[in-house]
Amino acid sequence: MTQLVAQHHLASPPSSAISDAATRPRVASRRSVLADASQLVRPRIAMMVLVTVFAAMWLTSGSRELNWLSVVGVLFGTAVVAASSSIANQILERHTDRLMARTASRPLAAGRLSNRSAWLLVVAGFIGGFGCVWLAGNLQAACAAMLTWILYVGVYTPLKRITPLNTAVGAVAGALPIAIGWLAADGPQQLLAGDISASLAVAALGTLLYLWQFPHFMAIAWLYRKQYGLADLKMLTVTDPSGLRAAGQSLAAALAMIPVSLAMAIPSGSIRMFLTAALASTVYVLVSVNFAFRRDDRSARILLFTSLGVLLILMTSAVAFSAPKILTGSYL
């Protein structure tokens, strides 16, 4: 009897082990939900959008004090609209996403999220984000956010199955967040009052952002050209497997960024801003030249990573070297 009791105690796992075993599925489930949410909203893209909106608001405000409550509200609303557009994009592309290894695990492509639930998130995010940008900023900024959504979801996404020109259209959608920030910071009113300097700087920054996207996305298109081909997406590296046209567009865009850097620096008279932006653009040109000559995965990967550094430098210089701001006093 004593032996049986002893064996029973030996065979029975401690209560803490049972508790740990019961907790593991819940932890794994939470991680899975967080991973799915991250894939749906694509936080890195959303962060890039928010940085551009903030930079535009900062440049537009000039020497005026920013309303930081408005800034936070506009950024939050923009992030929600961006998340909505990302989910809508994945709904429309769920069939092609299943054909590519890099996107096959997305929640909609893998069937972990229903279309109905996804559309509810899209509608709620669009309405909520639009309203937030309107309340925190103004109606014009909210309409710019709506136009960005329409261009990305309604034009760029279907064009990927039709023509390589999709990149040029997608770059417009990628640069439009600059307009959200400019409108939210009362850029049109300043323009009507005769102050064109801030608007010129913002326009130059928007142009830089538009041009920046060509080398960036051509590098991605080259690295995943086989997957895009399997999904029958009309990327330039699919329709022209040699990569010459993709390399040419990358190099032309990078070259055009150098004079635009000067236009961005003129309003503030900041030599440091011009030199920083021009130097970053020159490096971008050199890396694009390397890709044009080699047209291999290594040169494309170097171009891709360089593009991220160039974007960071451009946005940082736009904020750091622009007109000084008054950061004290009332923010309301």
What annotation goes with each model-predicted range?
Residues M1-H95, A118:
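Topogenic membrane-insertion module of multi-pass membrane proteins
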Residues A17-S32, L92-L113, M218-R245:
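Cytosolic, membrane-interface loops and tails of multi-pass inner-membrane proteins
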Residues V51-F54, P107, V169-A185, R245, ...:
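Small-residue-rich segments of transmembrane alpha-helices in multi-pass membrane proteins
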Residues V51-L59, S63-R94, R102, F126, ...:
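Membrane-embedded alpha-helical segments that form the functional core of polytopic membrane enzymes
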Residues N115-G187:
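Intramembrane alpha-helical segments
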Residues V285-I313:
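Interfacial loop-to-transmembrane junctions
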Residues T316-L332:
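Juxtamembrane boundary at the C-terminal end of a transmembrane helix
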